[in-house]
């Protein structure tokens, strides 16, 4: 049965297991946070979904959304004297957006929660091992190209979690991250990541120039 979720459109992709701090200053999202805080702690959920077209801020900013997002659990909210909030959230599970209700102060979506499947269990261990090697190689190339140390995050044992971590921390554009989020299973995600990591490593090796590493657990959105 579809689930109704308040939505927080952002210019980024949130993945399950990743931490996302947010600075909430728009009135509509302040209201959303207050309504979430009135709920029992385990029900304080909203949907983070990437903006396909438009911008984060303003009543008419969002023009189109991607179809797959991530449920965020509100873990902490600190309110400022002027009513702004600094909140800390964690991605929990993916969802597919089915219907959009724009009649209230903020968007509400009718969503289907997407299960986390490993996929091909015979192929998964091989891809898991290959992605670990490719990710470490990529980080080494990034460090050499940027001439700055790049810390290696602790890699989880679970291949599903590994796939989300690699997707969130590799320097990819929004469309590529979104495609990784929307992959049907963990094996498909790892397979795509292996190709992307090899591509990015080759580019870094050739160009000796790199974007800033995105190894923090989550960016702060100005929303």
Regions found by a protein language model. Give the residues of each.
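N-terminal low-complexity, acidic/polar interaction/targeting segments
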Residues: 1-223
